[in-house]
Swiss-Prot record:
Gene3D superfamilies: 2.30.30.30
Functional note: One of two assembly initiator proteins, it binds directly to the 5'-end of the 23S rRNA, where it nucleates assembly of the 50S subunit. One of the proteins that surrounds the polypeptide exit tunnel on the outside of the subunit.
Protein name: Large ribosomal subunit protein uL24
GO molecular function terms attached to this record: rRNA binding; structural constituent of ribosome
Family, similarity comment: Belongs to the universal ribosomal protein uL24 family.
Entry keywords, A to Z: Ribonucleoprotein, Ribosomal protein, RNA-binding, rRNA-binding
Keyword RNA-binding part of the UniProt annotation: yes
Subunit structure: Part of the 50S ribosomal subunit.
Swiss-Prot/TrEMBL GO biological process terms: translation
Cellular compartments per GO CC: ribonucleoprotein complex; ribosome
Length: 103
């Protein structure tokens, strides 16, 4: 399994799919499936039954996972590809467009 280039809290732009050109913040990362949950992106309608914990039930709108290959990290206001390099003895992410270290 490869290292995820996108982390929780990153600002990303969707480059493929129904929400193309939209931007959002990463809520969750699933490295096993290579998917992300992005705030306000890939919204689905879920119908829930009333239960003990959810007395009301009804229709809920929530984010569905989107593949990590369909988003690009936004760095300095522009989408960029992400690479890894060694900074001393630490492995850090860097923006391939500018060469600057991201974190």
């Amino acid at each position: 399994m490869a290292t995820m280039k996108i982390k929780k809290g990153d600002l990303v732009k969707v480059i493929a799919g129904k929400d193309i050109n939209n931007e959002g913040k990463v809520i969750a990362v699933n490295a096993k499936n290579n998917t992300l949950l992005v705030e306000g992106i890939n919204m689905v309608t879920k119908h829930t039954k009333p239960s003990m914990s959810n007395q009301q039930g009804g229709i809920v709108h929530q984010e569905a996972p989107i593949d990590a290959s369909n988003v690009m990290l936004i760095h300095d206001g522009k989408p960029t590809r992400v690479g890894f390099k060694m900074d001393g003895d630490k492995k850090v992410r860097f923006a391939k467009s500018t060469g600057k270290v991201i974190d």
